[in-house]
Amino acid sequence: EISEKEQRKRFKKLEASADTAWRVTEADWERNRCYKKYARITKEMIDATNVPWAPWTVIDAAHKEKAALAIMEAVSSAMEAALEKKAAGRETPRFEPPLPPDKYKKGILSRVDLEKTMDREEYRKKLDQLQKRLERLHGDLYRYRIPVVLGFEGWDAAGKGGAIRRLTSHLDPRGYQVCPTASPSSTEKAHHYLWRFWTRFPKDGHMAVFDRTWYGRVMVERIEGFCTEEEWHRAYQEINDMEAHLVHSGAVVLKFWLHIDK
């Protein structure tokens, strides 16, 4: 089970420094107090949206540097697969319509190995290799005009921002955009909740990295009462359909959940 205690520990560490205290809000503490409810809904959300065309990759975030390597490895592998398919002239496969949430394979979170470790020397060697690999692949994706959508979710203080910085540190800044997701503006509220994400999806050959995503609809908005039960139930199908549209149009879609457990 996810540790409420570990999250509190990270919040207190952030609050102890004047440079990082601003990152912890009362809303963060409130979510920590509702920890068990969030844990249950997180499992439901991942099980319902872990689809073949846009599967979740659950990352052990207890060790932030190791987490960054796992993310970079997954992104690199997905890029290489997309480039190979493009070079071979293969069409994007068509998937069957999404299944109802209760029909998906369950338990992805429970299968994550949170006991792996890595020494410092091995980490630095792998980091250098992966950064060079990503730099090369980023250029290849631009030449082949393949768009990439990366979505990062996870527990508060799990290290999403640090993982994104390590991932993008050697990429050409002209070819990617980091999209932090805050509360919707009045203009965004006047549209369908997915509209504000559609407007930030990348053009061909570019990458969009979302720090928090459209999954807020079935998590934060659901728990805090910003949408009705009918709306968040419907959102599972809408999200699966949206991701299928992206993949069918040739995009690479990867979703990461940063997991902590102590």
What are these regions (language model features)?
Residues E1-K262:
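Glycine-rich phosphate-binding loop of ATP-dependent small-molecule kinases
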